[in-house]
């Protein structure tokens, strides 16, 4: 699998010795899979331009690409083990609705702090008092594990999605 397919993911971990490249300039083609959108946002324009222009191969721990990953691990086995642990933790301990809204707030963030504040406030107020919010607070107060059951439904969030999808239909969740 190419690294460009991982760029939109919420969490990326890698073995520090893994090799990756965006070889498009060496193949005479353009970037793909929204990498022109995600890459500069993840590692900065200067590093993204360097990587895309050279088309070279890098180790995951190279300073040019290491910021693509939230964590680098010393062996492939430890990488898989860690990734599964993180996935299990998310599945067992987080609200899917809250996680989706938080991800979308960061990925589709408005261009100014003021607009972002207004959108975050709207999302926050829509989540306050939901079944997942009530369960999250109650489980915290009772010092027990939360049992989140919420499902992301467009009708529950009339402002979602707030970004212009440019001809793409609303997601069916």
Predicted feature descriptions by range:
Residues 13-18, 60, 69-119, 125-135, ...:
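C-terminal long alpha-helix characteristic of the crotonase
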Residues 143:
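Conserved N-box asparagine in the HATPase_c
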Residues 1-97:
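Crotonase-fold acyl-CoA enzyme core
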């Amino acid at each position: 699998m190419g690294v460009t397919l991982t760029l939109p993911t919420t969490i990326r971990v890698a073995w520090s010795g893994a090799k990756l490249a965006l070889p498009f300039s060496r193949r005479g083609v353009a970037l793909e899979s929204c990498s022109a959108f995600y890459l500069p946002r993840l590692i900065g324009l200067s590093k993204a331009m360097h990587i895309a222009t050279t088309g070279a191969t890098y180790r995951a721990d190279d300073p040019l690409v290491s910021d693509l990953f939230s964590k680098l691990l010393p062996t492939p086995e430890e990488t898989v083990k860690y990734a599964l642990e993180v996935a299990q933790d998310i599945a067992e301990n987080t609200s899917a609705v809250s996680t989706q809204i938080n991800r979308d707030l960061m990925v589709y963030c408005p261009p100014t702090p003021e607009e972002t504040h207004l959108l975050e406030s709207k999302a926050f107020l829509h989540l306050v008092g939901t079944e997942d919010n009530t369960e999250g607070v109650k489980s915290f107060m009772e010092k027990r594990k939360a049992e989140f059951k919420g499902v992301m439904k467009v009708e529950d969030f009339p402002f979602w999605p707030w970004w212009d999808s440019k001809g793409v239909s609303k997601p069916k969740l």
